[in-house]
């Protein structure tokens, strides 16, 4: 009988030679295998959520841009917009009700009174802004006045009452901005002697205006947060004007070659 034996060392050596092949086979994935990325489910953002976040980002940027544009326009209107010319001047007028065809140099000086105003002209916007300070002797109220030729409106802010009054622009009394500017230049240069007469106009308060937004930027700026009322004009005459004693106040001003006394009654 023949006994067959195997060398254990040789068997272990051959087993070690076969190990790299098996490891290489383990690294080669079959063609139909699917790769799986093992991540934490909490770290994965759904596609719908990412799209919603992108839309919110876009809308937020759009609103910010719109706010910057509107805010810039608002600041420009309030701070950067300057009048083309600013004048502080006065006009002498005859107080009594004597009708003169032309102002006379022989008229007694005591009959003349003076209106002083601060006038700002926004020629490009066709707007005149008149500030009447507290008169020294006359029994009239200080006021701020806006004549808006684009809106065809006039607004009076009585500074004593802190109330606004709006009426259609009377172009027969109020000079256009360019003409008024020429008049003021002539007065300043001394080529025109501002001695004139007084026109009376009578207005009656009617309805209250709840919203002044539609009255234009300049009147809105004047009358915002003020009680604002409509005015109705009565017949404007030169000379004596019958007045009602109760609930009336006057504003004396000029935006022409003559002075105007505006009587406003409730």
Swiss-Prot record:
Lumenal-facing ranges: 76-266
Entry GO terms, CC: endosome membrane; extracellular space; Golgi apparatus; Golgi membrane; Golgi-associated vesicle membrane; organelle membrane; plasma membrane
The keyword Secreted belongs to this UniProt entry's keyword annotation: yes
Domain BRICHOS: 137-231
Topology feature Cytoplasmic, residues: 1-54
Keywords: Cell membrane, Disulfide bond, Endosome, Glycoprotein, Golgi apparatus, Membrane, Secreted, Signal-anchor, Transmembrane, Transmembrane helix
Origin superkingdom: Eukaryota
Site residues (Cleavage), renumbered to this chain: 243-244
Glycan-bearing residues: 170
Transmembrane annotation, as ranges: 55-75
Cleavable signal peptide: none
GO biological process annotation, one example: negative regulation of amyloid precursor protein biosynthetic process
PTM annotation: The ectodomain C-terminal part of the imBRI2 is processed by furin producing a secreted Bri23 peptide and a mature BRI2, membrane form (mBRI2). The remaining part of the ectodomain of mBRI2 containing the BRICHOS domain is cleaved by ADAM10 and is secreted (BRI2C, soluble form). The membrane-bound N-terminal fragment (BRI2C, membrane form) is further proteolytically processed by SPPL2A and SPPL2B through regulated intramembrane proteolysis producing a secreted C-peptide and a BRI2 intracellular domain (BRI2 ICD) released in the cytosol. Glycosylation at Asn-170 is important for cell surface localization, but doesn't affect furin- and ADAM10-induced proteolytic processing.
GO molecular function: amyloid-beta binding; ATP binding
Functional summary from the UniProt entry: Plays a regulatory role in the processing of the amyloid-beta A4 precursor protein (APP) and acts as an inhibitor of the amyloid-beta peptide aggregation and fibrils deposition. Plays a role in the induction of neurite outgrowth. Functions as a protease inhibitor by blocking access of secretases to APP cleavage sites. Mature BRI2 (mBRI2) functions as a modulator of the amyloid-beta A4 precursor protein (APP) processing leading to a strong reduction in the secretion of secretase-processed amyloid-beta protein 40 and amyloid-beta protein 42.
Record family assignment: Belongs to the ITM2 family.
PANTHER family: INTEGRAL MEMBRANE PROTEIN 2B (PTHR10962:SF4), INTEGRAL TRANSMEMBRANE PROTEIN 2 (PTHR10962)
Subunit structure: Homodimer; disulfide-linked. Interacts with SPPL2A and SPPL2B. Interacts with APP. Mature BRI2 (mBRI2) interacts with the APP amyloid-beta A4 protein; the interaction occurs at the cell surface and in the endocytic compartments and enable alpha- and beta-secretase-induced APP cleavage inhibition. Mature BRI2 (mBRI2) interacts with the APP C99; the interaction occurs in the endocytic compartments and enable gamma-secretase-induced C99 cleavage inhibition. May form heterodimers with Bri23 peptide and APP amyloid-beta protein 40.
Listed name of the protein: Integral membrane protein 2B
Gene responsible for this protein: Itm2b
């Amino acid at each position: 009988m023949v006994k067959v034996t195997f060398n254990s060392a040789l068997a272990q050596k051959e087993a070690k030679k076969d190990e790299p092949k098996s490891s290489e086979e383990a690294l080669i994935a079959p063609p139909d295998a699917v790769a799986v990325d093992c991540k934490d489910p909490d770290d994965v953002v759904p596609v719908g959520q990412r799209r919603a976040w992108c839309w919110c980002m876009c809308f937020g940027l759009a609103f910010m841009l719109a706010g910057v544009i509107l805010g810039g326009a608002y600041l420009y209107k309030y701070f950067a917009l300057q009048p083309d010319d600013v004048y502080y001047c006065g006009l002498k007028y005859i107080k009594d009700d004597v009708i003169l065809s032309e102002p006379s140099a022989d008229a007694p000086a005591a009959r003349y009174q003076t209106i002083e105003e601060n006038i700002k002209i926004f020629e490009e916007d066709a707007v005149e802004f008149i500030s009447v300070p507290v008169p020294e002797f006359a029994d009239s109220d200080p006021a701020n006045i806006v004549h808006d030729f684009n809106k065809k409106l006039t607004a009076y802010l009585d500074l004593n009452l802190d109330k606004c009054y709006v009426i259609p622009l009377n172009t027969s009394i109020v000079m256009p901005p360019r003409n008024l500017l020429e008049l003021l230049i002539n007065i300043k240069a001394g080529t025109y002697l501002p001695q004139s007469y007084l026109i009376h106009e009578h207005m009656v308060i009617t309805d209250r205006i709840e919203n002044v937004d539609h009255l234009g930027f300049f009147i809105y700026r004047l009358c915002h947060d003020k009680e604002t009322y409509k005015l109705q004009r009565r017949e404007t005459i030169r000379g004596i004007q019958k007045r009602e004693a109760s609930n009336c106040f006057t504003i004396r001003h000029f935006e022409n070659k003559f002075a105007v006394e505006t009587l406003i009654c409730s």
